[in-house]
Amino acid sequence: MWIPVVGLPRRLRLSALAGAGRFCILGSEAATRKHLPARNHCGLSDSSPQLWPEPDFRNPPRKASKASLDFKRYVTDRRLAETLAQIYLGKPSRPPHLLLECNPGPGILTQALLEAGAKVVALESDKTFIPHLESLGKNLDGKLRVIHCDFFKLDPRSGGVIKPPAMSSRGLFKNLGIEAVPWTADIPLKVVGMFPSRGEKRALWKLAYDLYSCTSIYKFGRIEVNMFIGEKEFQKLMADPGNPDLYHVLSVIWQLACEIKVLHMEPWSSFDIYTRKGPLENPKRRELLDQLQQKLYLIQMIPRQNLFTKNLTPMNYNIFFHLLKHCFGRRSATVIDHLRSLTPLDARDILMQIGKQEDEKVVNMHPQDFKTLFETIERSKDCAYKWLYDETLEDR
């Protein structure tokens, strides 16, 4: 039995039409719990979950003026650049991948990569650096291409005309002659750079949505991303039930999606900081001074070939994200409490199938446990509907 999909958000409409996730819609103009057929009353609770909206990546909240807080970090130390070039290129016996370098700035790392034999596409968002970057590629037979583009603004969700440095990944990859390969194929290319200093979490969310939906850069295959990330966000990303205070939704999403490896650690002080006015010689803002005491971690994120299964697909991943957000929204609650709000299926039976007790807490569930939980619900045949949500709460 299939549900009507009128009024569903686009991603959920696709899920319903594809059969990946069956919903019982609860709302003022839809069936309520009391209208459900008796065979579907499987452990229902009195409350229904809010379907969490997709994050808006266009307008990040600001606590102060943009000019006073925005800054970028660049590799300007020659020795560090040579070290990173060796890390990115890997073993000499392997043919080098095409490298997409994000915001290379003054091009110290770019030059080291070229000297090591790499083929580089420099995606630079600041026009000031472009002439110098282009000069590095002279007499190199096309080993360097420089494009005015901000990697973190690829495929903006705002709609309308895309203006540089934002860009369409389809147009970018077509211009570079890069074709899509199957998900099970080898890594087609590498992306290297640094997450935005004031937008690491936001960038991780955008990439997560792109990866699980196989859109943007991930439409072309299992793109390897190598990024420097701040110490605090790194600790959260790698947290597990052993670190419950740091363990959160992105921990689960990324640990399931990718093999994550630390390639290098470097103090903040090893990088030069630039603002819109140029190099920042004497940072005085307390927030920045605190960051300078931390380390930056260079992490490698390679998407897993076995991420997608019959029951977790690019068509229903958004339901999985909703399950995680719902659970970590009340992280101290038991899993069974959340299940009673998320699905009309028998919550006790589901927990029994995945080998968990009724008193299992959210923060005690490992990433693979959440995936197993989701897939168990998806493949269940006990009820006509798999998931519950209240469409009247959707956009609140």
From Swiss-Prot:
Keywords: Methyltransferase, Mitochondrion, RNA-binding, rRNA processing, S-adenosyl-L-methionine, Transcription, Transcription regulation, Transferase, Transit peptide. It catalyses: adenosine in rRNA + S-adenosyl-L-methionine = N(6)-methyladenosine in rRNA + S-adenosyl-L-homocysteine + H(+). Residues 1-19 form a transit peptide. Its EC number is 2.1.1.-. S-adenosyl-L-methionine binds at V75, E124, D150. Residues 330-331 are annotated as: DNA-binding. Pfam families: RrnaAD. The keyword rRNA processing applies. Residues 44-64 are annotated as: Disordered. Induction: By the nuclear respiratory factors NRF1 and NRF2/GABPB2 and PGC-1 coactivators. Coiled coil: none annotated. Ubiquitously expressed. It is an enzyme of class 2 (transferase). Belongs to the class I-like SAM-binding methyltransferase superfamily. rRNA adenine N(6)-methyltransferase family. KsgA subfamily. S-adenosyl-L-methionine-dependent rRNA methyltransferase which may methylate two specific adjacent adenosines in the loop of a conserved hairpin near the 3'-end of 12S mitochondrial rRNA. Component of the mitochondrial transcription initiation complex, composed at least of TFB2M, TFAM and POLRMT that is required for basal transcription of mitochondrial DNA. In this complex, TFAM recruits POLRMT to a specific promoter whereas TFB2M induces structural changes in POLRMT to enable promoter opening and trapping of the DNA non-template strand. This is Dimethyladenosine transferase 2, mitochondrial. It comes from Homo sapiens. The gene is TFB2M.
